[in-house]
Amino acid sequence: SDVLELTDDNFESRVSDTGSAGLVEFFAPDATANDVPSP
C-alpha cells in the first residue's frame, strides 16, 4: 500500500471522496508516549 501525506488541502479528495475503506494514522510530532488523546 502507498503511504500518503494528508494535508488540509488534500484530505477530502484522498480520504472522504474515494468511496473505499482505508486506514488513517494521525501523528503529532510534539506528542509524547504518555499523551492520551481526548475526543
From Swiss-Prot:
The keyword Endoplasmic reticulum applies. GO terms for cellular component: endoplasmic reticulum; endoplasmic reticulum lumen; melanosome. It comes from the Eukaryota. It catalyses: Catalyzes the rearrangement of -S-S- bonds in proteins. Predominantly expressed in liver. Low in brain, testis and colon. Not detectable in pancreas and skeletal muscle. Within the major histocompatibility complex class I (MHC I) peptide loading complex forms reversible disulfide-linked heterodimers with TAPBP as part of its protein folding chaperone activity. This is essential to assist the dynamic assembly of the MHC I complex with high affinity antigens in the endoplasmic reticulum. Its EC number is 5.3.4.1. One of its GO terms (biological process) is adaptive immune response. It is found in: Endoplasmic reticulum; Endoplasmic reticulum lumen; Melanosome. Protein disulfide isomerase that catalyzes the formation, isomerization, and reduction or oxidation of disulfide bonds in client proteins and functions as a protein folding chaperone. Core component of the major histocompatibility complex class I (MHC I) peptide loading complex where it functions as an essential folding chaperone for TAPBP. Through TAPBP, assists the dynamic assembly of the MHC I complex with high affinity antigens in the endoplasmic reticulum. Therefore, plays a crucial role in the presentation of antigens to cytotoxic T cells in adaptive immunity. Part of the major histocompatibility complex class I (MHC I) peptide loading complex composed of TAP1, TAP2, B2M, MHC heavy chain, TAPBP, PDIA3, and CALR. Interacts with ERP27 and CANX. Interacts with SERPINA2 and with SERPINA1. Interacts with ATP2A2. This is Protein disulfide-isomerase A3.
